[in-house]
């Protein structure tokens, strides 16, 4: 698309948004409908320990649902440039993508952007002198590059969305999500406990580790504890936190801690990002996103 065509497309979408402004009553209704679905509620929040406290907040999945309910808005990311970094990949050199995550409310003309760079590298374990050494190697596949950039963009998109959306909408959504988690699951408590144990087992978490985290036998688990562990599971499944950070093994255990699986075998691992304080949604590591950009 040429620059003139792109400008025309943006102006047209803004004009349409002005002609059909959002109805806050409809926004609230759509938000309630989305957050009342158990599948969304179960993935709507994350929680993980950090510095002796628990970090908790809305996930990218909830942010997607809310910007959809808000309407007349667009959010996503784009790559704007690439350049060569001779110092990347442990001094061997690599390409670097310059990207922008954004959220644009076309009706109010409010736009938030976050620029970031992504080195085209991945971690690779190598053995030197009988010791395992972590090294950075350059990516060659365009698919790997795209997935890495999308991964790095995810929490920045969430941050942009949360800055554009009014705070009351996010707060009400979290309240609805909480009620859905409390009353939306009609299974018996023993069935919920067995399901929870099976899910954690996929990531190498044993029954003993769950019981140590809970402080009592698994059969004594309560509904609020299942909800809390569900948020922890979301954090582990999305790569926000490592299994061993939440469920440490005994020092005498000889069992190797399994790595958190990535989205696909070809997906590169992503380095832990630097915490960026002061911007909502930027206090957690990367999510695995499901989109490049979307409009509502």
Model region roles, listed by residue range:
Residues 247-279:
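Long, low-complexity intrinsically disordered segments
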Residues 115, 246, 266, 290-293:
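Intrinsic disorder/low-structure terminal segments
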Residues 1-97, 102-259:
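Polyanion-binding surfaces on beta-sheet-dominated domains and ring/shell assemblies
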Residues 271-296:
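Long, low-complexity, intrinsically disordered segments
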